[in-house]
């Protein structure tokens, strides 16, 4: 499919309008309380634009009703913490607050922590957004630059999303190659010399650490360091048992990394990547930031050749008589690609 003509609008607009755009707040459109917690680091460098079909509206009351339905679908059907976008632009020419300026969206895996996601909605299927909607989006972007939310040299990647794929029931999730991985040196890992992996790995095993969770990077680094000490000093492992650990801050922490065997699952340590979510997830699953980070890491492993493309994904409890990864987390990973019970 060729690039939609309006998608290029923001490359050529002068962006001289510095007036504050009219933004319909979450309270005004009747949103449920915001449950997302992963923060954006501002200013972001990217803008991602989507168009949502099947939500036709030309009045604020109707557009608000459409957004309430979208939020319900996002939370209760897909399992996200809220709507996927930072802002949504109605064909009525109004900007509607999604998760806002400071919270990461869930619109485009690999870009959520470095971009603002803006979705157009309300226009007839097959038609471009109205001039009023494009003008509102232009004003929003100008304001974002003025207030320091968006870099003046921002990039709008051409991800070439098909309109037919933008239905919220079937979102397209383009990814960049790899997430940012917090290295061993950052969390002050002890130096070790352990056996090498047999790469590419054939399996991914999802685990939970069953201890304290963390939502701030400094806290996660402390938890990872303590896990390494426990594994080495109490359980006599060669190193921390996991290849990577994922925090509720959305961070991926290098355990033994790609090339070293883990100590997570007897019989699989040399052929499986062990990815551990930091925390206890029997009743409540990890947050969206953590789940996305893990999925990005798996995709990264395939792209970089550390994991065979026809890999199998399993929960820890599928191969060991253990609670890990917890039923709440297990219920989610059982819907992921390549899952095998």
UniProtKB/Swiss-Prot annotation:
Q: Which keywords has UniProt assigned to this entry?
A: Antibiotic, Antimicrobial, Disulfide bond, Glycoprotein, Immunity, Innate immunity, Repeat, Secreted, Signal
Which residues are in the N-acetylmuramoyl-L-alanine amidase domain? Answer: 77-179, 200-325
Q: How is it modified after translation?
A: N-glycosylated.
Between which residues do disulfide bridges form? 178-300, 194-238, 214-220
One GO cellular component term noted in the UniProt record for this chain: protein-containing complex
Q: Where in the cell is it found?
A: Secreted
Q: Which residues form a coiled coil?
A: none
Signal peptide, first to last residue = 1-17
Give the protein family: Belongs to the N-acetylmuramoyl-L-alanine amidase 2 family.
Question: What's the stated role of this polypeptide?
Answer: Pattern receptor that binds to murein peptidoglycans (PGN) of Gram-positive bacteria. Has bactericidal activity towards Gram-positive bacteria. May kill Gram-positive bacteria by interfering with peptidoglycan biosynthesis. Also binds to Gram-negative bacteria, and has bacteriostatic activity towards Gram-negative bacteria. Plays a role in innate immunity.
Q: Matching PANTHER family, A to Z?
A: PEPTIDOGLYCAN RECOGNITION PROTEIN, PEPTIDOGLYCAN RECOGNITION PROTEIN 3
Can you name this protein? Peptidoglycan recognition protein 3
Originating organism: Homo sapiens (Human)
